[in-house]
Amino acid sequence: ITDYDVSYLENSGYESDLGLSNIFAYEEYVNAFYSQYGKKVDKLSFLLGLRYEDSKQEIDQRTTNQFEIKRYSDWFPTLNLSYEFSKMESITFGYSKRIQRPRGWNINPFPRRNSVTSLWRGNPFLDPTFTNSLEIGYLKRYKKFTINSEIFYSNSKDNNVRVTEDTGELITVTGGDDDELNPTLLVPVLETYPINLSENTRFGGVLNLTYTPSRSVRLNGSFTLNNTKIRGEFKNQNFDSDNTSWNARFSSFIKLPFDISWQLFGFFRGPSETAQSRNKAFGTVTSAFQKNILDRKGTISFKISDVFNTGKWRYETFTNTFFREGEGQWREPSYVLTFSYRFNDKNNKRTRRQKSNDLNFGGGDDERIFND
């Protein structure tokens, strides 16, 4: 529920400003049941699953008097196969059907102004996205080295994408009377909102390598390459696009002298492009140190997030009538020093796990800094 009301006192009482107030109620009901059956025969194992879901959404935007009820139901099968050539080598196959429901901010139709020239609004008529996925994986373990690879294919219907349009409104933007490099301009106001396009197909592979030369050193790296094809049309505009993108991760855990643990984590994402937007490449590196003190009852941790201040994403949005550049950053580089003390020795290990959860790298899938 969003309950944000801006009212002004008039002669007859308080009157809401419909341009600023946002009173939005959203309820979602999901009823489901599922069953599973698995078995292992010699080196072959399988797991079959079937889930049924019935969903209901109630969307009530009271400021703009928009009310919508949506219901949908479907079956979601799952199949997982695994064959072990040996304890050190195996191959897997998986099929699944999944549903991705739109989040509340994607369906709230009340406009939100990100800047004087940029608006965002949700789409109350947004449907969920249904995805069928196939995956084939191969795992090979050596004494100090592990290779984990995967090839994947997915096809999504009613894919959720964002579109940007010119509202026709113009805003005067000026750099000041003495700023000759930034003269006064009339800038169009752009509005972005999500829609369902017909189809999204992804095909690619993942390679994950782990190297553990000793108990004091553990190195891990992964690389993902995928090709995405989007097919769809909206308001007589073709949104077809073909794009190949990549991302990479690495992490390391090293035991240093004086009982100091050091962990390093990095994430890099290559450029990507759709019919209306272009995202530039970016990457970020985070580092942390930890030392146990006071007979291992106390722990000092020091974490540096985004060491090189490179965790900024830059993007471009374009059509035949406008071109926009933007830049964003979750947060600037930060430095966190933490001290913890464990009073109960019997629960030391459990406490260390809880504290390490507080020190994560943040953003997307959280990465734990230290493992017990």
Language model region names:
Residues K39-K43, W75, Y83-K87, F130, ...:
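Outer-membrane beta-barrel strand-turn architecture
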Residues E10, E28-T63, Y72-T78, K87-S133, Y153-V187, Y211, R215-N227, ...:
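Surface-exposed extracellular loop regions of Gram-negative outer-membrane beta-barrel proteins
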Residues T224, S241-D372:
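Conserved C-terminal beta-signal and adjacent last beta-strands/turns
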Residues E15-Y34, D127, Y142, T146-R218, ...:
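Outer membrane beta-barrel strand-and-loop segments of large Gram-negative receptors
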Residues I1, V41-K43, Y52-E58, Y95-R101, ...:
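Transmembrane beta-strands of outer-membrane beta-barrel pores
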Residues S35-K39, L79-Y83, L126, I136-K140, ...:
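Residues on the lipid-exposed face of transmembrane beta-strands in outer-membrane beta-barrel proteins
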